[in-house]
Design a protein with these regions (language model features):
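Substrate/cofactor-recognition hotspot
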Residues: 123-153
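Extracellular glycan-recognition surfaces and repeat-rich motifs
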Residues: 1-21
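Extracellular carbohydrate recognition and processing domains
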Residues: 64-112, 121-127
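Short beta-strands within extracellular/lumenal beta-sheet-rich domains
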Residues: 19-44, 56-59, 82-87
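Beta-strand acidic-aromatic groove motif in beta-rich domains, primarily in extracellular
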Residues: 47-48, 52, 57-64, 110-114
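Beta-strand cores of secreted/periplasmic/IMS beta-sandwich domains, seen most often
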Residues: 39-51, 99
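Active-site-proximal structural scaffolding
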Residues: 42, 57, 80, 92, ...
Length: 153
């Protein structure tokens, strides 16, 4: 069963939706591991998700794998507040992919929090994620780079 929020001895985790999330703080920052999704087909222009936790690029992160290689990655911001982030994946349309959540850090902020991963075609400023992501909150999109974006509440 996924964690329902904040784990013992962890700062307050917020910003996730529903009753659970991926939270690798289990038994503190000393635990490590990966979680890999089943294969899926990229059917939309973007993949959006909520992310929080440690900022260790390549070590506490979420990755998109296409054809067996990492093509997109994102990391937390050393904060327990999960925020909307995502990737432009239009170039990978109709290809098979996997999501991998990585925690390979045992020190401070050695964990990652992920929730509500989904595919969407939305990108314009002020456009909310699709209803499955959260129809009750208005989002503004902030571009972070050519292939990454963030929704800000």
């Amino acid at each position: 069963k996924p964690p329902s929020g904040t784990l013992p001895n962890q700062m307050n985790v917020s910003g996730f939706l529903g009753n659970g999330l991926v939270n690798t703080y289990f038994r503190g920052d000393r635990t490590t591991g990966t979680l890999t999704s089943p294969e899926f087909t990229i059917q939309r222009k973007r993949i959006a998700f909520l992310i929080g936790g440690g900022r260790h690029p390549g070590k506490t992160c979420i990755e998109l794998h296409v054809d067996g290689r990492v093509v997109r990655t994102a990391t937390g911001q050393n904060n327990e507040l999960l925020q909307w982030r995502g990737w432009d994946v239009a170039e990978f349309g109709e290809r098979t992919a996997r999501i991998r959540i990585v925690d390979q850090v045992t020190g401070g902020w050695g964990h990652i929090n992920i929730d509500h991963i989904g595919q969407t075609d939305q990108r314009q400023v002020g456009t909310p994620p699709p209803p499955a992501l959260d129809p009750w909150t208005q989002y503004v999109q902030v571009l972070l780079g050519s292939n990454e974006f963030m929704f800000v509440r």
